[in-house]
């Protein structure tokens, strides 16, 4: 199959692509587009720090020198992952514009897979692949729709965190038919970002299974959500204050060090 992956230029997307692309490339032709960020760059100091560790640290400080090394680490940078693609990964921040639609059509995908992509697809984009658009959402649907929902689950004291694999059926956010929900125990010693990253091994396995089902010309079983759930935007200062009072952290550099070091050759 021809599969187009839509992702965001951040750490979690890269971790997910490292899990997916080597396996998908064995059987499928892959192309990929990325958004630079989700929403606008935050001005709150706490969220700005999170943005630095998720995005700026990789894109401006960590990955450029690694890309110039002759060897590769256990995880690949975005440029390194391009080896699994039919063409280098392309920026696409305007997928609903005429040029954006043309870019998606040029890949001629049978299936589109969205992972943390920072833009909303309109119906013209959704209708391009004849098999449809899959999305791997880092939260339990329909309860936790929107962005940074691991934050909301931690704030609520949830003992388990979830990812949801679902179809994007229309332009509404995180409302499509649900294929599977994968849970992992909350790490009480982890931070928001480390707990979010822990969702992707099981989430990507579910995604690979669904793609294998489609490749076999079958349809994954999918169920329409039984309620609209709750939609969350970025946390405001009150939510952040409550998060910190509960003893949580957005980022713990010590917890991220093993992940970041995995990009360096050993």
Residue ranges and their predicted role:
Residues 1-266:
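One-carbon transfer enzymes
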């Amino acid at each position: 199959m021809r599969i187009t992956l839509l992702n965001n230029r951040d750490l979690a997307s890269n971790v997910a692509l490292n899990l997916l692309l080597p396996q998908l490339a064995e059987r499928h032709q892959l192309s990929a587009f990325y958004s630079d960020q989700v929403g606008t760059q935050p001005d709150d100091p706490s969220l700005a720090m999170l943005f630095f560790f998720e995005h700026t640290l990789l894109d401006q400080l960590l990955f450029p020198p690694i890309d110039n090394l002759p060897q590769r680490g256990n995880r690949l940078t975005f440029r390194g992952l391009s080896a699994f693609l039919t063409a280098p990964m392309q920026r696409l921040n305007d997928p609903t514009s005429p040029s954006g639609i043309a870019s998606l059509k040029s890949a001629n995908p049978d299936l589109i897979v969205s992972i943390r992509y920072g833009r909303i697809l309109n119906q013209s984009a959704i209708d391009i692949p004849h098999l449809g658009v899959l999305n791997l959402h880092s939260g339990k649907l329909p309860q936790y729709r929107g962005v940074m929902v691991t934050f909301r689950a931690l704030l609520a004291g949830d003992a388990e965190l979830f990812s949801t694999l679902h179809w994007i059926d229309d332009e509404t956010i995180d409302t499509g038919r649900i294929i599977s929900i994968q849970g992992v125990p909350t790490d009480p010693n982890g931070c928001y970002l480390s707990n979010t990253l822990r969702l992707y091994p099981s989430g990507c396995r579910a995604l690979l299974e669904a793609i294998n089902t489609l490749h076999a010309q079958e349809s994954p079983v999918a169920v329409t959500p039984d309620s609209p759930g709750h939609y969350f935007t970025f946390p405001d200062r009150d939510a952040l204050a409550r998060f910190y009072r509960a003893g949580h952290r957005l980022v713990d550099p010590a917890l991220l060090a093993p992940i970041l070091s995995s990009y360096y050759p050993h």
